[in-house]
């Protein structure tokens, strides 16, 4: 109560922020006549003037009013688009490193030009991040004309570019691209063998469009670069044939002589937990699988891999649905993005899940992959010196943005008042009744010519609805992952009179739905069909479409604008709001309503019991609908419950990934220093001394007399590592103290090293150290990632021993990291001492082969969304003594099963 009184007196934080920015808007408006009076060349020359002032130390904040006024004037001259006052506020919010929440149709694409132009004046590069290649290309071309007019260069990063094209795009003042492309380029750069081959510059300023989609919805999905293992794929087919013989059961509580008076009992061969997205064998199921696979004990260490793949096959059959989670296209399983409904070709689930689904669908199975490099979007975007974002819906996730990214959300007022009523939800008992009601409402709208956008949460549901509409003879467009190519075209015309569009989730996001139709889109379509037409003819067609669409716009406004019809609630309220936000843009009329049933996934998994009780209490008959505040409240509570659960998962993930992030930074920094030639010899000398120290500590033990040291093992270790026989007179052996032995060993090793250096020469030695060190780092880092994966899989069990799994993970991960650093030093030293002088062309060939090997057969994966942390693919191979132990303990093989 006290807080609300204070808020009334001083205003909310959002109101105070807007109040602070309005005087700057007035200042920009005051400069408008001055900028309008400049010629094109004079306006363009302002960019050079700003760059000089910036280079001399003037802050961007002091340049802001003039720079924004120049950019606004350029927008008017190039596109006849003038930034509104609220768009200037949006630009200032982005420049200050915050998130601007702007409703659909308020011109976010144009807003981004203001902070992008201002920050590009530093010459450090600005990245504008979009959700797909289409938007990256569209926005870089569309807004790029403004930047080019002002003398700035623009680049775009999309799938399929080679390194030279990428390097050129990143060198531009402003670079557009997708989050996946930016992230994978970072990982790829850190696998290269020359700084000249890097494509990215240091991270300065990033504007993330649809920031909620990228930083929240995709935060649980790590980017993974992986290489194939040599494992046979036969096991997936064998296990897949077992699954149909297993019966799904359930867990129930029965009376028992326990403290609670109840115990859990499982029926059937396996149980499914849809909330946790997991499937588990029961005791009966384990026995049946053992019998079918003809093995004696599924939990025997020899068969643990079978257990893992059986569980993944269960998940593939019980939890992953065709045309919902994936589609099968041309003999390939392609993932469907859960949040956007878009296909993600080339992306694969990890940890054997993708192979299990391929076996289930009877398509060719590709080998599992081993992780070579990985990063989460959370840690990628936190590398930018300044990060900002914009979206139509961020306020519901403001807490998460602040806690994880230290980003505040500012809600920007609309340019015109919102005229869209959002009608209460209508709930039915069954999905059949719900769809019947949806068809009736569509008929009503269609008869009067009102355009309708129907939102579904999966391809499967959009196709069911499409079939029902075909039976009724109602013409419509279906927009889902299968029609991805026509996405923008369909969405652009969804506001035309009588148009009915069915769309999955957020498909078409980024393209405005204009009432009456989009004349530019229609003219472009005509141009594609008539490529040889003269420019005059195109101009006449465009004018014709503009007149038609303007007249149709007025008709559609009278009919009530675009009606949004949601057929199911999403787990996140934000995504429901995004669907609603497609209507009522820039003061246009519109409306929205959601139709639900107790069979919908959200209500069935998270809230159906409570909602069902309310419906029974209100005596709702079959076929009868209910619109009640209690029901709406129960649904919102179910959504809040899921949102809180997902937030905890993302928070949990970043706490685990922060450990890996610090290790990744150390390795990547070390690689860059080696590539830059920074103190290569000094680094190697340190490795040499560390290796000498490790050998001395292992054999010359304090408080043990020298006569009892294992001299045979010492001689073998020195020979194996340094390639020479250590020469210690027999009469002095027994009298050596550990410190004397260290000194003697160090002198002998350094003498041998100096001999190598003399015969190789400084230049060749530096080159060899660089190549061998990089090879050792990449090889050991790959194995370390595998060890960390195994550690993550088993760390939860530490909780049963009254230990904090998170703290245990940090300790174990640190120990594994230090072991890896020791192995890198050991491998580098050993190879340098054993290497022989070769011709220069042999060394160059070795380096070239190494680069080709590293870049060959790499695969770009999206790791599966984990419950605790990403779990990239495993590989199985025979372990050498210093490799991570295959049993999954996280220890070296020699200190575990190899004892």
UniProtKB/Swiss-Prot annotation:
Cross-referenced SMART domains = SecA_DEAD, SecA_PP_bind
GO MF entries: ATP binding; metal ion binding; protein-exporting ATPase activity
Write down the InterPro entries for this protein, in alphabetical order.
Answer: Helicase_ATP-bd, Helicase_C-like, P-loop_NTPase, SEC_C_motif, SecA, SecA_DEAD, SecA_motor_DEAD, SecA_preprotein_X-link_dom
- Region feature Disordered, mapped onto this chain: 846-899
- Any idea of its EC number? 7.4.2.8
Q: List the NCBIfam families hit by this protein, alphabetically.
A: PRK12904.1 (NF009538), secA (TIGR00963)
Give the residues the record marks as binding Zn(2+).
Answer: 885, 887, 896-897
The cofactor required is:
Zn(2+)
Which residues participate in ATP binding? 87, 105-109, 512
Q: What is known about what this protein does?
A: Part of the Sec protein translocase complex. Interacts with the SecYEG preprotein conducting channel. Has a central role in coupling the hydrolysis of ATP to the transfer of proteins into and across the cell membrane, serving as an ATP-driven molecular motor driving the stepwise translocation of polypeptide chains across the membrane.
Would you tell me the protein name for this molecule? Protein translocase subunit SecA
- Subcellular localization: Cell inner membrane; Cytoplasm
Group of enzyme by EC? translocase
SUPFAM superfamilies per record: Helical scaffold and wing domains of SecA, P-loop containing nucleoside triphosphate hydrolases, Pre-protein crosslinking domain of SecA
Instruction: Provide the GO biological process annotations.
Output: intracellular protein transmembrane transport; protein import; protein targeting; protein transport by the Sec complex
Tell me which HAMAP family the record gives: SecA
What reaction does this enzyme carry out catalytically? ATP + H2O + cellular proteinSide 1 = ADP + phosphate + cellular proteinSide 2
Q: How does it assemble?
A: Monomer and homodimer. Part of the essential Sec protein translocation apparatus which comprises SecA, SecYEG and auxiliary proteins SecDF-YajC and YidC.
Q: What is the lineage of its organism?
A: Bacteria, Pseudomonadati, Thermodesulfobacteriota, Desulfuromonadia, Geobacterales
| Alphabetical UniProt keywords | ATP-binding, Cell inner membrane, Cell membrane, Cytoplasm, Membrane, Metal-binding, Nucleotide-binding, Protein transport, Translocase, Translocation, Transport, Zinc
- Indicate yes or no for the key word Amino-acid biosynthesis: no
Q: Check the record and name the Pfam families matching this protein.
A: P-loop_SecA, SEC-C, SecA_DEAD, SecA_PP_bind, SecA_SW
How does the cofactor attach, per the note? May bind 1 zinc ion per subunit.
